[in-house]
């Protein structure tokens, strides 16, 4: 992939081994693991490091993630790519469900839908995504989320359906 026409912008980041994180959280409930990640006592998953987001608050059935939109999130039309808000929604909604799961139980996204209300830019400032479990079944759960700025202005909202599996 080309470095760009001018090559005057760079971004370097690192991440921890995701299998090590999985090993360290084995035997923990979802909420225990998520609270340790939110507190900085466990490293965030690589997707959080790549996009620059992570959990800041977690309670049973809901989670709040934050990210500050930056130039490296931009698409070719000069705004933040919708994939950032979608990834934020997917992660937050999934973690809201994860916060309700016992040790040894996992989930995977079956479907995620997002509605983008207005564009994000690097001048938007930090955004938050707050998600809540709507239905927590034995094998399927649903959640909803909202992406807002510091003033509560809505940028995107969505829903997610996840498959629950494991012990």
Task: Explain the meaning of each model-derived region.
Residues 1-167:
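Terminal targeting signals and extreme-terminal segments of soluble enzymes
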């Amino acid at each position: 992939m080309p470095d760009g026409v001018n090559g005057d912008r760079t971004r370097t980041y690192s991440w921890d081994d995701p299998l090590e994180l999985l090993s360290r959280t084995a035997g923990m409930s979802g909420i225990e693991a998520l609270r340790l990640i939110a507190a900085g006592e466990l490293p965030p998953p690589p997707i959080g490091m790549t996009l620059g987001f992570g959990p800041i608050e977690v309670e049973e059935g809901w989670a709040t993630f934050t990210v500050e939109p930056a130039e490296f999130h931009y698409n070719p039309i000069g705004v933040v790519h919708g994939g950032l808000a979608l990834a934020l929604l997917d992660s937050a909604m999934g973690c809201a469900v994860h916060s309700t799961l016992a040790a040894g139980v996992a989930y995977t996204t079956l479907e995620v839908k997002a509605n983008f209300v207005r564009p994000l830019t690097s001048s938007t400032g930090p955004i938050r995504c707050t998600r809540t479990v709507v239905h927590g079944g034995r094998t399927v759960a649903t959640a909803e989320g909202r992406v807002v700025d510091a003033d509560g202005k809505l940028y995107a909202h969505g829903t997610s359906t996840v498959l629950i599996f494991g012990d």
